[in-house]
Protein backbone atom coordinates (compact mmCIF):
# COMPACT_ATOMS: atom_id res chain seq x y z
CA UNK A 1 0.00 0.00 0.00
CA UNK A 2 1.06 3.59 -0.51
CA UNK A 3 1.60 5.81 2.50
CA UNK A 4 -1.71 7.54 1.77
CA UNK A 5 -3.85 4.42 1.32
CA UNK A 6 -2.31 2.72 4.35
CA UNK A 7 -3.74 5.39 6.64
CA UNK A 8 -6.88 4.58 8.60
CA UNK A 9 -7.84 7.98 9.94
CA UNK A 10 -10.16 8.90 12.77
CA UNK A 11 -12.39 11.97 12.88
CA UNK A 12 -14.17 13.84 10.08
CA UNK A 13 -11.29 16.20 9.26
CA UNK A 14 -8.75 13.38 9.10
CA UNK A 15 -11.10 11.28 6.97
CA UNK A 16 -11.69 14.19 4.57
CA UNK A 17 -7.94 14.78 4.22
CA UNK A 18 -7.35 11.06 3.65
CA UNK A 19 -9.97 10.79 0.91
CA UNK A 20 -8.76 14.03 -0.67
CA UNK A 21 -5.28 12.51 -0.87
CA UNK A 22 -6.61 9.40 -2.57
CA UNK A 23 -8.59 11.49 -5.05
CA UNK A 24 -5.64 13.74 -5.86
CA UNK A 25 -3.43 10.71 -6.47
CA UNK A 26 -6.13 9.10 -8.62
CA UNK A 27 -6.24 12.21 -10.82
CA UNK A 28 -2.45 12.03 -11.31
CA UNK A 29 -2.47 8.33 -12.08
CA UNK A 30 -5.52 8.66 -14.33
CA UNK A 31 -3.51 10.64 -16.85
CA UNK A 32 -0.98 7.81 -17.03
CA UNK A 33 -3.68 5.16 -17.34
CA UNK A 34 -5.54 7.07 -20.05
CA UNK A 35 -2.59 6.66 -22.40
CA UNK A 36 -1.75 3.08 -21.46
CA UNK A 37 -1.60 0.62 -24.35
CA UNK A 38 -4.25 -2.06 -24.58
CA UNK A 39 -1.60 -4.77 -24.20
CA UNK A 40 -0.42 -3.28 -20.89
CA UNK A 41 -3.95 -3.09 -19.52
CA UNK A 42 -4.63 -6.66 -20.56
CA UNK A 43 -1.39 -7.88 -18.95
CA UNK A 44 -2.42 -6.22 -15.71
CA UNK A 45 -5.91 -7.75 -15.85
CA UNK A 46 -4.48 -11.22 -16.37
CA UNK A 47 -1.95 -10.67 -13.58
CA UNK A 48 -4.73 -9.59 -11.20
CA UNK A 49 -6.70 -12.72 -12.09
CA UNK A 50 -3.65 -14.87 -11.36
CA UNK A 51 -3.01 -13.05 -8.07
CA UNK A 52 -6.58 -13.71 -6.94
CA UNK A 53 -6.27 -17.41 -7.71
CA UNK A 54 -2.90 -17.66 -5.97
CA UNK A 55 -4.30 -15.89 -2.90
CA UNK A 56 -7.59 -17.80 -2.77
CA UNK A 57 -6.96 -19.35 0.65
CA UNK A 58 -5.95 -16.00 2.14
CA UNK A 59 -9.00 -14.29 0.61
CA UNK A 60 -11.33 -16.91 2.06
CA UNK A 61 -9.69 -16.53 5.47
CA UNK A 62 -10.11 -12.75 5.42
CA UNK A 63 -13.71 -13.20 4.31
CA UNK A 64 -14.28 -15.53 7.27
CA UNK A 65 -13.51 -12.57 9.56
CA UNK A 66 -16.20 -10.53 7.82
CA UNK A 67 -18.72 -13.36 8.00
CA UNK A 68 -18.09 -13.88 11.71
CA UNK A 69 -18.42 -10.16 12.40
CA UNK A 70 -21.56 -10.00 10.25
CA UNK A 71 -23.18 -12.91 12.05
CA UNK A 72 -22.37 -11.27 15.38
CA UNK A 73 -24.06 -8.07 14.16
CA UNK A 74 -27.19 -10.00 13.22
CA UNK A 75 -26.94 -10.02 9.42
CA UNK A 76 -29.57 -12.35 7.99
CA UNK A 77 -28.91 -15.38 5.82
CA UNK A 78 -29.35 -13.52 2.53
CA UNK A 79 -26.98 -10.75 3.62
CA UNK A 80 -24.35 -13.27 4.70
CA UNK A 81 -24.75 -15.11 1.40
CA UNK A 82 -24.02 -11.90 -0.52
CA UNK A 83 -21.02 -11.24 1.71
CA UNK A 84 -19.48 -14.69 1.33
CA UNK A 85 -16.38 -15.57 -0.69
CA UNK A 86 -15.49 -19.18 -1.40
CA UNK A 87 -13.21 -20.90 -3.90
CA UNK A 88 -15.90 -20.80 -6.58
CA UNK A 89 -16.42 -17.06 -6.18
CA UNK A 90 -12.69 -16.38 -6.31
CA UNK A 91 -12.57 -18.35 -9.55
CA UNK A 92 -15.57 -16.40 -10.87
CA UNK A 93 -13.77 -13.11 -10.17
CA UNK A 94 -10.67 -14.35 -11.99
CA UNK A 95 -12.69 -15.56 -14.98
CA UNK A 96 -14.49 -12.21 -15.12
CA UNK A 97 -11.19 -10.33 -15.28
CA UNK A 98 -9.96 -12.56 -18.09
CA UNK A 99 -13.20 -11.94 -19.96
CA UNK A 100 -12.68 -8.18 -19.60
CA UNK A 101 -9.15 -8.57 -20.96
CA UNK A 102 -10.61 -10.32 -24.02
CA UNK A 103 -13.07 -7.49 -24.76
CA UNK A 104 -12.27 -4.85 -27.40
CA UNK A 105 -10.68 -1.72 -25.96
CA UNK A 106 -12.94 1.28 -26.67
CA UNK A 107 -10.26 3.87 -25.81
CA UNK A 108 -8.87 5.68 -28.85
CA UNK A 109 -11.62 4.46 -31.19
CA UNK A 110 -12.35 7.07 -33.87
CA UNK A 111 -15.79 7.32 -35.44
CA UNK A 112 -17.65 9.54 -37.89
CA UNK A 113 -14.54 11.02 -39.50
CA UNK A 114 -15.78 13.11 -42.43
CA UNK A 115 -14.49 15.90 -44.69
CA UNK A 116 -16.09 19.31 -44.29
CA UNK A 117 -16.45 21.83 -47.13
CA UNK A 118 -13.48 23.72 -45.68
CA UNK A 119 -11.27 20.68 -46.24
CA UNK A 120 -10.82 19.73 -42.58
CA UNK A 121 -11.77 16.30 -41.28
CA UNK A 122 -13.99 16.15 -38.20
CA UNK A 123 -14.64 13.06 -36.12
CA UNK A 124 -14.90 11.78 -32.58
CA UNK A 125 -12.45 9.85 -30.43
CA UNK A 126 -13.50 7.74 -27.46
CA UNK A 127 -11.58 8.58 -24.27
CA UNK A 128 -11.76 7.61 -20.57
CA UNK A 129 -13.97 9.56 -18.19
CA UNK A 130 -10.99 10.06 -15.86
CA UNK A 131 -11.52 9.14 -12.20
CA UNK A 132 -14.48 7.02 -11.13
CA UNK A 133 -15.67 6.71 -7.54
CA UNK A 134 -17.58 3.50 -6.82
CA UNK A 135 -19.60 3.14 -3.61
CA UNK A 136 -21.07 -0.29 -2.94
CA UNK A 137 -22.36 -2.65 -0.28
CA UNK A 138 -21.75 -6.21 0.84
CA UNK A 139 -20.56 -8.03 -2.26
CA UNK A 140 -16.73 -8.26 -2.24
CA UNK A 141 -16.69 -9.41 -5.88
CA UNK A 142 -17.62 -5.84 -6.89
CA UNK A 143 -14.11 -4.80 -5.83
CA UNK A 144 -12.57 -6.97 -8.55
CA UNK A 145 -15.29 -6.46 -11.16
CA UNK A 146 -15.31 -2.66 -10.87
CA UNK A 147 -11.53 -2.42 -10.83
CA UNK A 148 -11.30 -4.54 -13.98
CA UNK A 149 -13.82 -2.47 -15.92
CA UNK A 150 -12.24 0.82 -14.87
CA UNK A 151 -8.77 -0.43 -15.75
CA UNK A 152 -9.73 -1.67 -19.22
CA UNK A 153 -11.56 1.59 -20.00
CA UNK A 154 -8.52 3.63 -18.93
CA UNK A 155 -10.03 5.12 -15.78
CA UNK A 156 -8.48 5.40 -12.35
CA UNK A 157 -10.90 4.40 -9.62
CA UNK A 158 -11.53 4.87 -5.93
CA UNK A 159 -13.49 2.06 -4.30
CA UNK A 160 -15.54 2.41 -1.13
CA UNK A 161 -17.05 -0.92 -0.15
CA UNK A 162 -19.35 -1.67 2.74
CA UNK A 163 -17.86 -1.81 6.23
CA UNK A 164 -19.17 -5.36 6.60
CA UNK A 165 -16.75 -6.52 3.85
CA UNK A 166 -13.68 -4.53 4.87
CA UNK A 167 -11.32 -7.50 5.41
CA UNK A 168 -12.36 -9.13 2.13
CA UNK A 169 -12.05 -5.89 0.18
CA UNK A 170 -8.60 -5.14 1.57
CA UNK A 171 -7.39 -8.60 0.57
CA UNK A 172 -8.82 -8.31 -2.95
CA UNK A 173 -7.41 -4.79 -3.34
CA UNK A 174 -3.95 -6.08 -2.39
CA UNK A 175 -4.19 -8.62 -5.24
CA UNK A 176 -5.26 -5.87 -7.62
CA UNK A 177 -2.29 -3.69 -6.69
CA UNK A 178 0.07 -6.65 -7.14
CA UNK A 179 -1.38 -7.34 -10.57
CA UNK A 180 -1.15 -3.70 -11.66
CA UNK A 181 2.52 -3.58 -10.72
CA UNK A 182 3.18 -6.88 -12.49
CA UNK A 183 1.56 -5.44 -15.60
CA UNK A 184 3.74 -2.33 -15.47
CA UNK A 185 0.95 0.06 -14.46
CA UNK A 186 0.73 2.29 -11.37
CA UNK A 187 -0.63 0.43 -8.35
CA UNK A 188 -2.64 3.51 -7.40
CA UNK A 189 -4.77 3.16 -10.54
CA UNK A 190 -7.14 1.32 -8.18
CA UNK A 191 -7.38 2.62 -4.61
CA UNK A 192 -9.56 1.28 -1.83
CA UNK A 193 -10.85 3.57 0.91
CA UNK A 194 -9.74 1.52 3.89
CA UNK A 195 -11.52 3.36 6.65
CA UNK A 196 -15.01 2.21 7.59
CA UNK A 197 -15.92 5.70 8.82
CA UNK A 198 -19.15 6.76 7.09
CA UNK A 199 -17.68 10.25 6.70
CA UNK A 200 -15.52 8.81 3.91
CA UNK A 201 -18.58 8.54 1.67
CA UNK A 202 -19.39 12.21 2.13
CA UNK A 203 -15.77 13.16 1.50
CA UNK A 204 -15.68 11.19 -1.74
CA UNK A 205 -18.95 12.75 -2.92
CA UNK A 206 -17.45 16.20 -2.32
CA UNK A 207 -14.22 15.52 -4.24
CA UNK A 208 -15.48 17.11 -7.46
CA UNK A 209 -12.09 18.67 -8.17
CA UNK A 210 -10.63 15.23 -8.84
CA UNK A 211 -13.46 12.70 -9.37
CA UNK A 212 -15.44 12.73 -12.63
CA UNK A 213 -18.26 10.28 -11.98
CA UNK A 214 -19.79 8.36 -9.06
CA UNK A 215 -21.33 4.90 -9.42
CA UNK A 216 -23.33 3.68 -6.39
CA UNK A 217 -24.26 0.00 -6.16
CA UNK A 218 -26.52 -1.07 -3.34
CA UNK A 219 -29.87 -0.52 -1.71
CA UNK A 220 -32.22 2.40 -2.21
CA UNK A 221 -31.07 4.23 0.94
CA UNK A 222 -27.45 4.23 -0.23
CA UNK A 223 -28.32 5.47 -3.69
CA UNK A 224 -30.67 8.16 -2.38
CA UNK A 225 -27.93 9.42 -0.07
CA UNK A 226 -25.41 9.51 -2.92
CA UNK A 227 -27.80 11.40 -5.21
CA UNK A 228 -28.69 13.89 -2.46
CA UNK A 229 -25.13 14.64 -1.37
CA UNK A 230 -22.95 14.24 -4.45
CA UNK A 231 -21.35 17.24 -6.13
CA UNK A 232 -20.31 14.83 -8.88
CA UNK A 233 -22.49 13.35 -11.66
CA UNK A 234 -23.95 9.97 -10.69
CA UNK A 235 -24.67 6.88 -12.80
CA UNK A 236 -27.43 4.98 -11.01
CA UNK A 237 -30.77 3.26 -10.86
CA UNK A 238 -32.99 3.38 -7.79
CA UNK A 239 -35.37 0.47 -8.37
CA UNK A 240 -36.00 -2.33 -10.79
CA UNK A 241 -39.80 -2.32 -10.97
CA UNK A 242 -39.95 -4.31 -14.20
CA UNK A 243 -43.20 -5.13 -15.99
CA UNK A 244 -44.33 -7.81 -18.42
CA UNK A 245 -47.53 -6.99 -20.32
CA UNK A 246 -49.36 -9.94 -21.88
CA UNK A 247 -51.32 -8.47 -24.77
CA UNK A 248 -54.53 -10.07 -26.00
CA UNK A 249 -52.62 -10.79 -29.20
CA UNK A 250 -50.05 -12.91 -27.34
CA UNK A 251 -49.09 -16.49 -28.04
CA UNK A 252 -50.16 -18.26 -24.83
CA UNK A 253 -47.19 -20.63 -24.71
CA UNK A 254 -44.74 -17.74 -25.09
CA UNK A 255 -46.63 -15.72 -22.50
CA UNK A 256 -46.44 -18.49 -19.90
CA UNK A 257 -42.76 -19.17 -20.55
CA UNK A 258 -41.77 -15.50 -20.37
CA UNK A 259 -43.92 -14.67 -17.35
CA UNK A 260 -42.52 -17.60 -15.36
CA UNK A 261 -38.89 -16.96 -16.32
CA UNK A 262 -39.03 -13.21 -15.75
CA UNK A 263 -40.18 -13.73 -12.16
CA UNK A 264 -38.78 -17.04 -10.96
CA UNK A 265 -35.44 -17.54 -12.70
CA UNK A 266 -33.86 -15.43 -9.95
CA UNK A 267 -35.74 -13.31 -7.44
CA UNK A 268 -33.19 -10.95 -5.90
CA UNK A 269 -32.05 -9.13 -9.04
CA UNK A 270 -33.04 -5.78 -10.48
CA UNK A 271 -34.20 -7.20 -13.84
CA UNK A 272 -36.72 -9.63 -12.36
CA UNK A 273 -40.37 -8.89 -13.14
CA UNK A 274 -42.24 -7.33 -10.22
CA UNK A 275 -45.61 -6.55 -11.89
CA UNK A 276 -47.50 -8.63 -14.44
CA UNK A 277 -50.06 -6.80 -16.57
CA UNK A 278 -52.59 -8.88 -18.51
CA UNK A 279 -55.05 -7.68 -21.15
CA UNK A 280 -58.66 -8.31 -20.11
CA UNK A 281 -59.43 -10.19 -23.31
CA UNK A 282 -56.83 -12.88 -22.63
CA UNK A 283 -56.80 -12.90 -18.82
CA UNK A 284 -59.31 -15.78 -18.35
CA UNK A 285 -57.23 -17.97 -20.65
CA UNK A 286 -53.83 -17.21 -19.13
CA UNK A 287 -54.13 -16.16 -15.48
CA UNK A 288 -55.50 -19.37 -13.87
CA UNK A 289 -52.81 -21.50 -15.53
CA UNK A 290 -50.07 -19.01 -14.65
CA UNK A 291 -51.31 -18.83 -11.06
CA UNK A 292 -50.99 -22.61 -10.74
CA UNK A 293 -47.42 -22.49 -12.06
CA UNK A 294 -46.52 -19.66 -9.69
CA UNK A 295 -48.14 -21.54 -6.80
CA UNK A 296 -45.93 -24.56 -7.53
CA UNK A 297 -42.88 -22.30 -7.28
CA UNK A 298 -44.00 -20.68 -4.04
CA UNK A 299 -44.77 -17.25 -5.52
CA UNK A 300 -47.38 -15.15 -3.71
CA UNK A 301 -49.70 -13.25 -6.06
CA UNK A 302 -51.11 -9.86 -5.09
CA UNK A 303 -53.80 -8.87 -7.53
CA UNK A 304 -56.39 -6.33 -8.55
CA UNK A 305 -60.08 -7.23 -8.03
CA UNK A 306 -60.37 -8.87 -11.46
CA UNK A 307 -57.23 -10.93 -10.83
CA UNK A 308 -58.64 -12.06 -7.48
CA UNK A 309 -61.89 -13.07 -9.21
CA UNK A 310 -59.98 -15.24 -11.69
CA UNK A 311 -57.50 -16.53 -9.08
CA UNK A 312 -59.45 -17.03 -5.81
CA UNK A 313 -56.38 -17.59 -3.59
CA UNK A 314 -54.76 -14.33 -4.77
CA UNK A 315 -54.01 -11.72 -2.07
CA UNK A 316 -55.75 -8.37 -2.77
CA UNK A 317 -53.18 -5.81 -3.89
CA UNK A 318 -52.78 -2.42 -2.26
CA UNK A 319 -51.74 0.73 -4.12
CA UNK A 320 -48.25 0.30 -2.65
CA UNK A 321 -47.82 -3.05 -4.41
CA UNK A 322 -47.66 -1.37 -7.82
CA UNK A 323 -44.65 0.68 -6.62
CA UNK A 324 -42.71 -2.08 -4.86
CA UNK A 325 -39.52 -3.83 -5.90
CA UNK A 326 -39.97 -7.06 -3.96
CA UNK A 327 -36.75 -8.91 -4.83
CA UNK A 328 -38.66 -11.89 -3.44
CA UNK A 329 -41.21 -14.53 -4.54
CA UNK A 330 -44.04 -11.99 -4.57
CA UNK A 331 -45.69 -10.73 -7.76
CA UNK A 332 -48.21 -7.93 -8.30
CA UNK A 333 -50.77 -8.77 -11.00
CA UNK A 334 -53.20 -6.39 -12.70
CA UNK A 335 -55.74 -6.94 -15.45
CA UNK A 336 -55.85 -3.94 -17.82
CA UNK A 337 -58.23 -3.01 -20.61
CA UNK A 338 -55.50 -3.14 -23.22
CA UNK A 339 -52.28 -1.57 -24.48
CA UNK A 340 -53.21 2.02 -23.60
CA UNK A 341 -53.84 1.18 -19.96
CA UNK A 342 -50.73 -1.01 -19.78
CA UNK A 343 -48.50 1.81 -21.05
CA UNK A 344 -50.16 4.28 -18.69
CA UNK A 345 -49.60 1.93 -15.73
CA UNK A 346 -45.92 1.54 -16.62
CA UNK A 347 -45.46 5.30 -16.95
CA UNK A 348 -47.09 5.86 -13.56
CA UNK A 349 -45.52 3.04 -11.56
CA UNK A 350 -42.42 1.91 -13.47
CA UNK A 351 -38.83 2.73 -12.57
CA UNK A 352 -37.54 3.11 -16.13
CA UNK A 353 -35.46 -0.07 -15.89
CA UNK A 354 -36.88 -2.83 -18.13
CA UNK A 355 -40.37 -3.53 -19.46
CA UNK A 356 -41.62 -6.15 -21.91
CA UNK A 357 -44.66 -6.91 -24.05
CA UNK A 358 -45.76 -10.36 -25.20
CA UNK A 359 -47.71 -10.06 -28.45
CA UNK A 360 -47.87 -11.32 -32.01
CA UNK A 361 -49.29 -7.97 -33.18
CA UNK A 362 -46.52 -6.05 -34.96
CA UNK A 363 -48.21 -2.67 -34.63
CA UNK A 364 -48.73 -3.02 -30.88
CA UNK A 365 -45.16 -4.23 -30.42
CA UNK A 366 -43.83 -1.19 -32.30
CA UNK A 367 -46.00 1.14 -30.29
CA UNK A 368 -44.85 -0.40 -27.00
CA UNK A 369 -41.20 -0.02 -28.05
CA UNK A 370 -41.77 3.62 -29.00
CA UNK A 371 -43.92 4.77 -26.08
CA UNK A 372 -42.50 2.96 -23.04
CA UNK A 373 -39.71 5.20 -21.76
CA UNK A 374 -37.41 2.69 -20.09
CA UNK A 375 -33.71 1.90 -20.43
CA UNK A 376 -34.59 -1.49 -21.96
CA UNK A 377 -37.87 -2.26 -23.75
CA UNK A 378 -38.49 -5.79 -24.99
CA UNK A 379 -40.83 -7.72 -27.26
CA UNK A 380 -41.48 -11.41 -26.61
CA UNK A 381 -38.47 -11.79 -24.31
CA UNK A 382 -37.92 -12.08 -20.57
CA UNK A 383 -36.82 -9.01 -18.63
CA UNK A 384 -33.99 -11.18 -17.28
CA UNK A 385 -32.11 -10.48 -20.51
CA UNK A 386 -31.45 -6.89 -19.35
CA UNK A 387 -27.80 -7.55 -18.65
CA UNK A 388 -24.50 -6.35 -20.09
CA UNK A 389 -23.30 -9.85 -20.89
CA UNK A 390 -26.55 -10.77 -22.65
CA UNK A 391 -26.38 -7.52 -24.66
CA UNK A 392 -22.89 -8.33 -25.89
CA UNK A 393 -21.28 -5.61 -23.77
CA UNK A 394 -19.31 -8.05 -21.65
CA UNK A 395 -19.21 -7.24 -17.96
CA UNK A 396 -21.15 -4.26 -16.62
CA UNK A 397 -20.54 -1.87 -13.75
CA UNK A 398 -24.27 -1.42 -13.24
CA UNK A 399 -27.50 -0.45 -14.97
CA UNK A 400 -28.47 3.18 -15.41
CA UNK A 401 -32.05 4.38 -15.64
CA UNK A 402 -30.88 7.95 -16.25
CA UNK A 403 -30.73 9.44 -19.74
CA UNK A 404 -27.36 11.15 -19.25
CA UNK A 405 -24.53 10.04 -19.47
CA UNK A 406 -25.24 6.34 -19.95
CA UNK A 407 -28.52 4.41 -20.13
CA UNK A 408 -29.13 0.71 -19.61
CA UNK A 409 -26.31 -1.74 -18.81
CA UNK A 410 -23.08 0.24 -18.40
CA UNK A 411 -20.11 -1.63 -19.82
CA UNK A 412 -16.73 -0.44 -21.06
CA UNK A 413 -18.13 2.04 -23.57
CA UNK A 414 -20.35 3.56 -20.88
CA UNK A 415 -17.21 4.32 -18.85
CA UNK A 416 -15.84 6.45 -21.67
CA UNK A 417 -16.87 9.67 -23.36
CA UNK A 418 -16.11 11.21 -26.75
CA UNK A 419 -14.15 14.25 -27.76
CA UNK A 420 -14.12 15.92 -31.16
CA UNK A 421 -10.96 15.62 -33.21
CA UNK A 422 -10.15 17.85 -36.18
CA UNK A 423 -7.52 17.00 -38.81
CA UNK A 424 -6.16 19.61 -41.16
CA UNK A 425 -3.15 20.39 -43.31
CA UNK A 426 -2.46 24.01 -42.57
CA UNK A 427 -6.14 24.93 -42.81
CA UNK A 428 -7.26 28.33 -41.52
CA UNK A 429 -10.77 29.69 -41.22
CA UNK A 430 -11.65 32.42 -43.70
From Swiss-Prot:
GO cellular component: cytoplasm
Top-level enzyme category: oxidoreductase
BP GO terms, sorted: L-proline biosynthetic process
Record's catalysed reaction(s): L-glutamate 5-semialdehyde + phosphate + NADP(+) = L-glutamyl 5-phosphate + NADPH + H(+)
E.C. code: 1.2.1.41
InterPro entries: Ald_DH/histidinol_DH (IPR016161), Ald_DH_C (IPR016163), Ald_DH_N (IPR016162), Aldehyde_DH_dom (IPR015590), G-glutamylP_reductase_CS (IPR020593), Glu-5-SA_DH (IPR012134), GPR_dom (IPR000965)
Subcellular location: Cytoplasm
One matching Pfam family: Aldedh
Keywords: Amino-acid biosynthesis, Cytoplasm, NADP, Oxidoreductase, Proline biosynthesis
Alphabetical list of SUPFAM superfamilies matching this protein: ALDH-like (SSF53720)
Classification via CDD domains: ALDH_F18-19_ProA-GPR (cd07079)
Broad class of the protein's primary localization: cytoplasm
Superkingdom of origin organism: Bacteria
Annotated pathway: Amino-acid biosynthesis; L-proline biosynthesis; L-glutamate 5-semialdehyde from L-glutamate: step 2/2
One MF term in the entry's GO annotations: NADP binding
Protein function: Catalyzes the NADPH-dependent reduction of L-glutamate 5-phosphate into L-glutamate 5-semialdehyde and phosphate. The product spontaneously undergoes cyclization to form 1-pyrroline-5-carboxylate.
Family according to the record: Belongs to the gamma-glutamyl phosphate reductase family.
The protein's name in its UniProt record: Gamma-glutamyl phosphate reductase
Organism: Methylococcus capsulatus (strain ATCC 33009 / NCIMB 11132 / Bath)
Amino acid sequence: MTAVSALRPAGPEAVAAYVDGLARRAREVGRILSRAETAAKNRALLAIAAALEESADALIEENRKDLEAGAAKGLDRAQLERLGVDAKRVQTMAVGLREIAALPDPVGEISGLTYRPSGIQVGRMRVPLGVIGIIYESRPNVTADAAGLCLKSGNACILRGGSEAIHSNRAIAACIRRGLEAGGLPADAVQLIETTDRAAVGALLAADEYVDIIVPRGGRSLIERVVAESRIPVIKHLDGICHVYIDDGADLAKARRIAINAKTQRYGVCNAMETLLVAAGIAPAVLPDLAALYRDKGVELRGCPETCRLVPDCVPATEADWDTEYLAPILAVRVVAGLDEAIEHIHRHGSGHTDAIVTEDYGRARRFLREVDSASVMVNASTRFADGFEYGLGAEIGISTDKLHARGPVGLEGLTTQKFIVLGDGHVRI
